[in-house]
Amino acid sequence: MVETIRIGLIGAGGNTRVRHLPEFQKIPDVEIVAIANRSNESASAFAAEFNLEVETSGDPYEVIGSSDVDAICIGTWPNKHREYTIAALEAGKHVLVEARMAMNASEAADMLKSSEAHPDLVSQIVPAPMDFKSWRTIKRLVDEGESGELGTVREVHISILNGQNLAPNPELHWRDQTELSGMNIMMYGITVEMIHRWLGPTEELIADGHTFISEKLNTDTGEMVEVNIPDSLSVLARQTNGARVIYNLSTVATPTSPNGATLFGSKGTLVWSFAEDTLSFTPLGGTAGPYPHDDRSVFGWQVESDFVESIRSKAPVVLTNFQDGLEYMLSLIHI
């Protein structure tokens, strides 16, 4: 008989509503048993909205310390990830924590150290989802090197532009606030996470960023608030495998071509579509065409089921473990 896994939720924001709660509810022998939010009233309202008969609280430590909870899903802003993750692991709970991993690399290192002190517990970060279908195929082509169709990958250019800050009077978002988001900048961390899957870790980098929209309206207070997190960022990185990566991210520029990444190999060029998670390939001297994903390599969103499977089977976490999370947080140090 399969033992029921009892989940406690901390944070009732967008991803918890759209992803974590409904996906956990699909898994047999998994129960949501407790919810904590910034107030008991908001936690109770969330439970009522989704017809959940669970314990509610405005204190996350009541959920973390509950003997009725086996695993914790942390859906808060990054400013609480280190605190709640370490507390949950020390309380003997498995942890699924929202991305970005932490406020900075130091906090991420603390989280990794705590997870290593509790090897019997699963520690997982919600992964970057944009390349779920393609990453295994890309990694295979990169790893094959000269023996494969792409050859040796020497350069990668990745561009993520959306122009959301071009709207008149853009409103303050938590990602604009250093006290909530830490060193995280736009989609840089999530993009680095994907690049690391494909190519391996970053060895060194140089970067230049600027904040063009330096004030935004805080709709809670009605006041204009200073913004220090860049809304335009360019990074030139070198990976441990020798490849050079050029990042271009901006929320004050609209794309003239589709967002995505281009991998330039010695035998051809591979293009990954950010919006579609599809691939196209142009052999050297040839014409471009769709490139199929490898057989048995295409998976959609299965974050919660992967988490539960790791708890039940003790399978190692692939997407995304704390070591890989620390690697992408380390890439923020020099920016």
Predicted regions and their residues:
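Conserved SAM-binding strand-loop segment of SAM-dependent methyltransferases
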Residues: 53-59
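Contiguous beta-strand/loop segments that form the cofactor/metal-binding neighborhood of enzyme cores
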Residues: 186-278, 305-316
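Predominantly a Rossmann-like dinucleotide-binding segment in NAD(P)-dependent oxidoreductases
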Residues: 121, 129-225, 314
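Active-site loop of classical SDR/Rossmann-like NAD(P)-dependent oxidoreductases
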Residues: 15, 38, 272, 294-305, ...
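Core-facing hydrophobic residues within beta-strands of well-ordered domains
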Residues: 30-32, 69, 153, 202
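N-terminal Rossmann-like dinucleotide-binding module
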Residues: 1-51
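C-terminal helix-rich "cap/oligomerization" subdomain common to oxidoreductases
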Residues: 4, 30, 71-73, 109, ...
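Beta-strand-loop-alpha-helix segment that lines the small-molecule cofactor/substrate pocket
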Residues: 70-78, 82-130, 334
